Amino acid sequence: RSKTSLLKLFYRQEKPNQGLISLDGKPLDQMSVKETAKQMAVITQFNQLQFDCTVEEIVMLGRTPHLSFLQKEKDRDFALVEDALVKVDLLEKRNRLYSSLSGGEKQRVLLARALAQEPTLLLLDEPTNHLDIKYQLDLLTIVKNLQINVLAVLHDIQLACRYSDYLYLMKEGEIVYQGTPKETITPESLQAVYGVQSKVTWTEDQQAMIHYL
């Protein structure tokens, strides 16, 4: 399985052939979709909306798991949406149409929607895919500063090192290396996983500098 396929197992788009996945000690297959959505939010790499809404309307969709059928949003729901927009620095664009935003802004709207869910776990599948480097750094900096558990698929090794506390390196569907960035990203691991020779050095602020030979 690929890294994305592994993530799909967590948010239940695919079912495991064997084994068990639990969230806070409870097997996922024993949880309803709504119960799962109250604890887990997902941002995938394909987020083209088929209809146009304002930024605020899209972020409010994050409150859906917490509302019963036809229940109207309460003051707390609007407060959580506003707080999420503040965190992604888009409050001033709350009334803008989603389609009018840049790619980086659209991803931040989807992050705000995820935050409005109040999840205990945030899953990110290549959240910076197709974004310019500035927007990549902006988005990952916001995520890094959140007080929340995050499991992300990132293919850019240097970005993964910069923003992660713990890394898993996968090859052919299996985790072959894991640990802190400094423990995980070594010439030996890069040779084993990617088949490349390299020299890895670290800056004082623990950023990886990878030189391919």
Name the predicted role of every residue range.
Residues 19-27, 36, 96:
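Conserved ABC transporter NBD signature motif
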Residues 116-120:
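A short, proline-enriched helix->beta-strand linker immediately N-terminal to the Walker B motif
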Residues 187, 192-213:
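ABC ATPase nucleotide-binding domains
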Residues 97-101, 105:
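Conserved ABC ATPase signature
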Residues 11:
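Helix-to-loop junction immediately C-terminal to a conserved catalytic motif
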Residues 60, 75-93:
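Conserved ABC ATPase "signature" region
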Residues 122-126:
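Catalytic Walker B motif of ABC-type/P-loop ATPase nucleotide-binding domains
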